From Swiss-Prot:
Coiled coil: none annotated. Its main location: membrane. GO terms for cellular component: plasma membrane. It comes from Bacillus subtilis (strain 168). Keywords: Cell membrane, Membrane, Transmembrane, Transmembrane helix. This is UPF0699 transmembrane protein YdbT.
Amino acid sequence: MMSEPKRLHPVAVILNLCHTIIQTIKNIILPFFFVYIVNSNHTVRFYGAIALGVLFIWLVAASIIKWRRFTYRIEDDEFRIEEGLFVTKKRYISIDRIQTMNTSAGLVQQIFKLVKLQIETAGGGKEAEAVLSAISVEEAERIKEAVFKKKAQRRENELDEERLEAEEELDPSVEVQEHYRMNAKELLMAASTSGGIGVIISAVFALISQLDEVLPMDWLFDKFSFLQHASIGIYAVLIFIGLFIAWIFSIAGMMFRYANFQIIKKEQELVISRGIIEKHQVTIPLRKIQAIKIKENIIRQLFGFVTVSIVSAGGGDREKEEGALTILFPMIHKKKLPHMLRTFTPEYTLEENCRRLPRRALKRYLFRSVIFSLFLIIPLCIFFQPWGYLSVILLPIELLFGYLAYKEAAWTINGDRLQLTSRFIGRTTAIVLKKRMQVCKFSQSYFQKKGRLYTISTSVKSSSHMEELTVRDVGEEDAAFILKWYSYEKADG
């Protein structure tokens, strides 16, 4: 009976303990540990060891108490959770507010054949409303079935279409319509061009800065003091080796993250799964999709590959590597993209023939590309001669990016579908349906008014905020056409 209070699997004690230890290490233990190791006073070491032992025992006891006091049940059309170490906290989540329930399995869960269930609600923000960290696969399916059944019962008096959708969610025998699995070439391309090298380098510098505060680093500097007299060539080689190692680590991380990536389309929903060490699975109803975003960085564009994301209202992948987005295709060739969108998101198809910006918008793109750099370049050229003149190299590079941004900015309308393309460093194409647009804004600055240009932006609802899609400096006549298209729908509505 789902109305009876239930506890998590005892493995939740291990998960709670690991999480608490990691948080404690971040906040307390790391500096204490290094001070304890460096300090040669035996009395300090003795009491330090006792303190560590007492703290560990307390963390184990707290994890067991938390597990014992955590219960969940479904009662009176609510998902009820009671938890707390000393004070009992009660959370009642209305079944109507539950949008999606996603499962994932880390290394510990996989060993014991368990899953983590995340319950997400409308307007729940970036974090899941409730998390059951260790339950059996069968229990997760029972919870999903019970929730979907209650939602279906409460919607019996609504439109037939909504009732059918609820029945499809409930029906476990729905046949798989389409299936896609990312191949090895796409996985390698996604990993090697992900830009994760920046994250690795930032993490290394952050770690070094933390170690420098608690450990004397003079001995390390002494060992590498010979580099003070090294040539520029040696420095260049060392920097290259460091960047190459960071790049290899970023590739490995991305390959573990997106290995076994696959999409299964079942009637009116997409089931997306990925991962080796930690497996993730999310379910997105097609009716929750608000927009599709197609992104290309410079390297991927050269090879003809793109990344496709979904903006959804509720649900999605909570890791937020793309902000409020869920990855639909981590890496796919542009030639395959139109067919794949028609297959998995038939309402959101890609248009090849788009309307470009007028010629008079070019100077605005070129001006915006260099204006902020000029405030840096001019002082460098004046006060840091002659090396400051090297900063002038930035100008042609930025002008090139400004020209590309102008050249690739575009829009098109096909029926009730609006497609916007813009570029900053990488190129982004957004596809949105008229009925999903929360607002459509047409703004015009003083200088845009002189050039008869407008900035067009529209917002769609995502799980945590409003996602804005924008194209700058659209011609006045084009802006009027888009406004008429959007206003016509509102008048009909």
